[in-house]
């Protein structure tokens, strides 16, 4: 149970938290490019709208939640939270390939590691057999999370 909970926490943090942060950044950049002033009130409103759209009526978004942008150092350094989600999707896809194909997938992954930064990221992952230009790897990662949840529920049931 402990391992499953840890893995689920990792997926939640990287799939939910970081993607919501990336959406805030996308919106803030759009506002800045449109010449709008970016104030704390604007950031609170953006964050609140993003959280409300994501959670719908299942979670009450209070003032504290609207201000969570203030505690994220990512916003002040390099602005890259989406890479956490992408990395987790890619690593889940690679783990699935290794599980399903064994040594041939391992050999392709070693080729990726040897290639390093000689190819663009999408091309590099395609070398391993991972196509992030489609939504399939995301669907597969979400399915994996679903299987983990099922396994966790079973562990509590019996």
Regions found by a protein language model. Name each.
Residues 22, 28-158:
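C-terminal, non-catalytic "cap/extension" segments appended to globular domains
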Residues 1-32:
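Acidic/histidine-rich catalytic neighborhood
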């Amino acid at each position: 149970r402990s391992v499953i909970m840890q893995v689920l926490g990792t997926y939640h943090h990287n799939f939910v938290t970081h993607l919501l942060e990336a959406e805030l950044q996308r919106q803030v950049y759009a506002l800045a490019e449109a010449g709008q002033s970016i104030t704390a009130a604007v950031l609170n409103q953006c964050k609140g709208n993003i959280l409300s759209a994501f959670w719908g009526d299942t979670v009450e978004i209070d003032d504290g939640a609207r201000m969570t942008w203030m505690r994220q150092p990512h916003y002040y350094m390099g602005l890259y939270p989406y890479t956490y989600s992408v990395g987790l999707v890619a690593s889940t896809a690679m783990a699935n390939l290794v599980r399903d194909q064994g040594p041939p997938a391992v050999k392709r992954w070693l080729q990726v590691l040897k290639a390093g930064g000689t190819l663009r990221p999408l091309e590099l992952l395609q070398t391993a057999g991972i196509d992030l230009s489609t939504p399939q790897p995301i669907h597969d990662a979400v399915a994996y999370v679903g299987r983990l949840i099922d396994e966790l529920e079973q562990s509590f049931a019996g």
